[in-house]
A protein has these predicted regions:
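Short glycine/serine-rich loop segments
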Residues: 73-133
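Short, well-ordered alpha-helical
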Residues: 1-64, 68-69, 91-93
Length: 133
C-alpha cells in the first residue's frame, strides 16, 4: 500500500497542538521532528529512540528509550516521521481511555462519549486528520 504526502509534518504538528485541548489525545508531541517525511501517530507504548515513551503511566513518566522498536525503524525507512506519542489506557490495560495519569481521551466528534479502546488517542487523532497514519 502506498501513502501520499497529504499533510506536512509542520501542518500535522499544528493540528495536534490545536486539537490537544479538546481531545487530550497526545502524551508527547514531537515538536523537533524532522520536517521531511509523512507524519505518523504512534501509541505511547512503542519505543522511540530519544522520544519520551510512558505507556501513559506515571511510573514511566521520564522514560526515554535508547532504541527504536522494529516497527519504528521500518516506518522511518519507509519515509514516515513520528510526530506524536498518543495517549492510551495506562500500560495498555483497559478499554475506555479514562486514564488517571494523563486524563481521559475525548471522543473525536462527541465530548459526551469516550474515545474507547486501548488506542483511543491514536484513534481520535487519526479521525480528526492530525496525520494520515
Amino acid at each position: 500500500m502506498a501513502f501520499e504526502q497529504t499533510i506536512s509534518v509542520q501542518e500535522s504538528l499544528r493540528r495536534i497542538h490545536e486539537l490537544q485541548p479538546e481531545l487530550n489525545a497526545a502524551v508527547t508531541i514531537v515538536d523537533d521532528a524532522p520536517e521531511a517525511g509523512i507524519p505518523v501517530i504512534l501509541k505511547d507504548n512503542i519505543s522511540t529512540k530519544g522520544i519520551r515513551t510512558t505507556a501513559s503511566s506515571r511510573i514511566l513518566d521520564n522514560y526515554v528509550p535508547v532504541y527504536d522498536a522494529t516497527i519504528v525503524t521500518k516506518l522511518k525507512h519507509a519515509g514516515f516521521t513520528p510526530v506524536v506519542k498518543a495517549s492510551m489506557d495506562e500500560l495498555g490495560m483497559g478499554g475506555t481511555n479514562r486514564n488517571a495519569a494523563t486524563g481521559p481521551v475525548h471522543n473525536a466528534w462527541d465530548q459526551d462519549r469516550i474515545a474507547g479502546g486501548s488506542s483511543g488517542g491514536s484513534a481520535v487523532l487519526t479521525a480528526r486528520a492530525a496525520a494520515p497514519l
